[in-house]
Regions:
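Aromatic/basic-lined ligand-recognition segments
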Residues: 125-201
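N-terminal low-complexity, intrinsically disordered segments
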Residues: 1-83
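A short acidic-to-branched-hydrophobic micro-motif
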Residues: 7-13, 123-130
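Short acidic, glycine/tyrosine-flanked loop/strand segments centered on an H-E-D-like triad
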Residues: 67-92, 190-208
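Aromatic- and glycine-enriched beta-alpha-beta binding-site module
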Residues: 85-128
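Hydrophobic, Leu/Ile/Phe/Ala-enriched alpha-helical segments that form helix-helix packing faces
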Residues: 28-37, 103-118, 149-153, 220-235
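Long, compositionally biased interface segments
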Residues: 187-241
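Short, conserved charged micro-motifs
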Residues: 18-24, 137-141, 207-213
């Protein structure tokens, strides 16, 4: 499956202007500038939010209460002599695990550069897997869930939009949950998409520092991947009958 990741860090709100955010992450922006040419584009949707779209496929977003990095394949059209323009992939075609590791490294670096690093604390972390696939190519677990939802109707579902928030086993330190989003458009404009948004909310928020972020993302990555694999197999859906 050609799954792509997103990662997010949620913290107690800190209101910082977009100009100050951009100034604080200058070390990353400078590294992404080669021979005077920026390999990214910056947008400011509102005075307290900054988005950076990198040509490698990652989009970095900073808001008053969260930082997120999402991946999406990017293409550009290149003119050729005597023919139509051809599409060329410019993003990094890495497997899910490689993209996830890159996103985690970047979100840690980005968060530590921000003004919030000294004045806020982290209360939730999220890791997302998003996949486009035809129904015949869906993992068994997703297929079982769709088949169960289709039972009241005699034929196959021509379209659906499902959103489920499921609470997962937790501990005294954290509360886990997963938001399941499964969508099939009512036309041939796109193929179905299924998204698993695994989240860990901390009972007690923790300060922002490199060692803690690396430790938490290491164990959260492991927990999220194990859960995604469990969902794909779908043994727990056998109870659906």
């Amino acid at each position: 499956m050609a799954s792509v990741p997103s990662v997010g860090i949620f913290y107690a709100p800190v209101f910082v202007s977009s100009d100050r955010i951009i100034d604080s992450i200058a070390p990353m922006l400078n590294r992404w500038t080669v021979d005077g040419k920026a390999d990214f584009a910056i947008s400011v949707p509102d005075p307290l939010k900054v988005e950076i779209r990198h040509n490698n496929g990652f989009t970095y977003a900073v808001e008053s209460n969260r930082v997120s990095i999402a991946y999406q394949h990017r293409v550009k059209f290149r003119n050729i002599s005597g023919g139509r323009p051809v599409a060329e992939l410019i993003s990094s075609p890495l497997p899910f695990s490689g993209l996830l590791d890159a996103a985690i490294d970047d979100i840690i670096e980005l968060t530590l550069l921000l003004p919030i690093a000294k004045s806020s604390s982290i209360n939730r972390v999220g890791i997302v897997s998003s996949t486009h696939a035809d129904e015949d190519d869906m993992p068994p677990g997703v297929r079982k869930l769709i088949d169960f939802l289709a039972k009241p109707w005699p034929g196959a579902l021509s379209a659906y939009q499902v959103s489920i928030v499921g609470n997962l086993p937790s501990s005294k330190e954290y509360e886990d949950r997963c938001i399941y989003g499964i969508t099939k458009p009512d036309d041939d404009s796109d193929i179905p998409n299924y998204k698993f948004d695994w989240q860990r909310g901390y009972v007690t928020s923790f300060p922002i520092n490199k060692d803690t972020l690396q430790k938490e993302f290491q164990r959260n990555r492991k927990a999220a991947i194990e859960y995604f694999e469990k969902l794909a197999i779908g043994d727990e859906f056998d109870v659906l009958g």
